[in-house]
């Protein structure tokens, strides 16, 4: 599961680089992946790779 958010399942997006002459070359917009540790209801710790946006939402909901 490389370059994928393990909670929201979002992956990289594709687009173009644009020079001053407006030439277009393909590029990839990768997610800002972070590693977090969550506790399950049984007290077991699990490590997940999530995007910074997902981490921010989890912190807001009080899960991190």
UniProtKB/Swiss-Prot annotation:
GO molecular function, one term: structural constituent of ribosome
A single GO cellular-component term on record: ribosome
Keyword set includes Cell cycle: no
Gene that produces this protein: rpmB
Source species of the chain: Mesomycoplasma hyopneumoniae (strain 232) (Mycoplasma hyopneumoniae)
Superkingdom, natural source: Bacteria
Keywords carried by this UniProt record: Ribonucleoprotein, Ribosomal protein
Region of interest (Disordered), ranges: 1-23
Name this polypeptide is given: Large ribosomal subunit protein bL28
Family designation: Belongs to the bacterial ribosomal protein bL28 family.
Entry-linked Pfam families: Ribosomal_L28 (PF00830)
A GO BP annotation: translation
HAMAP family for the chain: Ribosomal_bL28 (MF_00373)
């Amino acid at each position: 599961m490389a370059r994928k958010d393990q909670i929201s399942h979002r992956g990289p997006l594709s687009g173009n680089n644009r020079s001053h002459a407006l030439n277009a070359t393909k590029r990839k917009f990768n997610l800002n992946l972070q590693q977090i540790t969550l506790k399950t209801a049984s007290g077991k710790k699990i490590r997940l790779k999530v995007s910074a946006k997902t981490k921010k939402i989890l912190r807001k909901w009080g899960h991190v």
